[in-house]
């Protein structure tokens, strides 16, 4: 019984620490992991169908993709 209570308390502590990260910071980390490059309006083909700025990623060739409206 003590083990179950300890496990529940530890789970609650971990969840509260995860929730402490701001949503905006989490989104910035996610966009960085996708390989988005908003400064030159290029997008990584592996980043998915959307660019960081909300524009669509258009594949111009196998090696070149750009963020287009």
Swiss-Prot record:
Source species taxonomy: Eukaryota, Metazoa, Ecdysozoa, Arthropoda, Chelicerata
Gene Ontology cellular-component annotations: extracellular region
Disulfide pattern: 36-52, 43-57, 51-67
Functional description taken from the UniProt entry: Insect active toxin causing rapid but reversible paralysis in crickets. No activity shown in mammals. Does not show effect on mammalian voltage-gated calcium channels.
Modified residues (Leucine amide): 68
Keyword Signal assigned: yes
Protein name, as recorded: U2-agatoxin-Ao1g
GO molecular function: toxin activity
Expression by tissue: Expressed by the venom gland.
Keywords on record: Amidation, Disulfide bond, Knottin, Neurotoxin, Secreted, Signal, Toxin
Propeptide: 21-34
Domain of life, per lineage: Eukaryota
Entry comment, domain topic: The presence of a 'disulfide through disulfide knot' structurally defines this protein as a knottin.
Localization per record: Secreted
Stated family: Belongs to the neurotoxin 01 (U2-agtx) family.
Signal peptide (residue range): 1-20
């Amino acid at each position: 019984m003590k083990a179950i209570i300890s496990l529940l308390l530890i789970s609650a502590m971990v969840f509260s620490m995860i929730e402490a990260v701001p949503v905006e910071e989490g989104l910035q980390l996610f966009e960085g992991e996708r390989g988005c490059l908003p400064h030159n309006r290029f997008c990584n083909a592996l980043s998915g169908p959307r660019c960081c700025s909300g524009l669509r990623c258009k594949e111009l060739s196998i090696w070149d993709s750009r963020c287009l409206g």
